[in-house]
Amino acid sequence: MSTTTTESANPSLAAQEKIEVDFTPKEHYGDWRDEFHREGCIIIRNAVSPERAQYYVDKQIEWLKNFELGFDEKDESTWTAEHLPVSFRGGKYYYGVAHEKSVWEARTEPGVMDAFAKLWETDELLCSFDGIKIDLPRRKDVKWTPWPHCDHNPDVKGLSCVQGMLNFAPNGPNDGGLIWMKGSAKVFNEFFAEQRKNEDAENFDHKHQEFFKFHEDHMKWFEDRGYAFTKLELGPGDLVLWDSRTVHHSCFAAGDQIRHAQYICMMPKRFATEKALETKKYCFEHYLPNTHLPHRWVTQIVHHCEES
């Protein structure tokens, strides 16, 4: 079975989907949700045990080796593209990885599901069919450049998604990992009150995009208002949540530790259309990925599966 996935920007479909979600936080929760709503991001320590985190590390290494391209986690000479499956900045999104047994096990860890259920105050949740993250340090065949961005449509001014990442391996200051600009979600509307050019395209059409890459001068705008990037230091089993309006990116691994993580996002089922649910079911049955969004843009993906 071969699978081809193409994206279709269809305004009639986009119009059917609710983009900005109806979610007004309470004035006070008395737990980590207060910090999340204040800063737009939060680290939830020990969402899963270190033992379970190591299990997922082992499964990710096993997944890489199953391609039989000669990769050996103990032999740095094999940490090159010719020994690895296709990826994007360390993210593995293809080959049906979104539906690997261990990937689903991570999504359904009680500590992960409970965090999203607590945030949204419902256990009727949809999960993203997203990828895994494996960053090999000191790779000489990779040119790494900063790519500050937000996974949010610039034309949508309110909250539309809370992204998540479950960390599996020790992640210190010299290890590759997530960098975010804490609190930057609060000035998202102010920044995009002016017309902004996406660094990836001069004539960028925001209408069908959930991604914006910032220029260097954009970063100065945030810095002038007191915002700065922070490299997260995470332990095995820590869960990170952030408002998709938060400016973030990742840094290249310079130490000895391989970075292991998984992107996990859950949103209330009530935010999805019937069409989105139908297409999501199709994706699940055919081992197809979606974006970080569990409830939207599912209908923007046209799938064609044929016998090879």
Swiss-Prot record:
It comes from Aspergillus versicolor. Part of the cluster that mediates the biosynthesis of a highly modified cyclo-arginine-tryptophan dipeptide (cRW). The first step of the pathway is perfornmed by the arginine-containing cyclodipeptide synthase (RCPDS) avaA that acts as the scaffold-generating enzyme and is responsible for formation of the cyclo-Arg-Trp (cRW) diketopiperazine. AvaB then acts as a multifunctional flavoenzyme that is responsible for generating the cyclo-Arg-formylkynurenine DKP, which can be deformylated by avaC. AvaB then further catalyzes an additional N-oxidation followed by cyclization and dehydration. The gene is avaO. This is Ava biosynthesis cluster protein O. Pathway: Secondary metabolite biosynthesis. It comes from the Eukaryota. It holds the Pfam family PhyH. Gene3D superfamilies: q2cbj1_9rhob like domain. InterPro entries: Phytyl_CoA_dOase-like (IPR008775).
